[in-house]
Amino acid sequence: MDSFFDVSSEDIRQLDDAALRELVGRLCEAEYRNEGRDTAGVLWGGHQDASDGGLDVVVRSGEGLASSQYLFRANVGFQVKKPQMQPAKIRGEIVKNGGLRPQIQELAEQSGAYIIVSSGDDCSEPALKNRIEQMRKSVGSTKHADRLFMGFIDCSRLATWVRGHPGIILWVKTRIGRSFKGWRPFDRWAYVPKGGEDRYLLDDHVRVFAV
């Protein structure tokens, strides 16, 4: 039986491209929300295959989160991939026409962070170091390259991040068809017929309904 508040690397692997990107966006929002910070600077959405300069989730804030492993810089860009991102593939994601992709160059100028997320990878420590080293080589001696933090998140490390946010664990389980009976994530639970009025009814009382 599944542990209620647990998620595995295999669970992460089962998410499709769009859900994977949404997961990273939700995690960034949750990190900021936990610190009482505005989530307006967490930008994600649109079509997964849209021409977005290589970044799928972008975080722009006045100040990073000192307590966060991935969001400690004020400007962070995530490139989210479902397939494996072997070292040989990395350069093509960072460099275009002999130079850094514009959004990655902008992150370097802002002393930001560029992070690749790959649910297809489950890296040992040496394999993780190889991928980050290839990222550094791809950036090379480009202007402001020394200001840019680079990171790589595989499926195991992404699962670890998710475990810190129980509500997102339930969201992942629902997306892969393994939701728990009697539990659903924040969502529209009531059926509203087409053309019907869809609004919350508020008063000054607290009610608990057993189902």
Predicted features, each with a name:
Residues M1-A210:
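Mixed-charge (Asp/Glu-Lys/Arg
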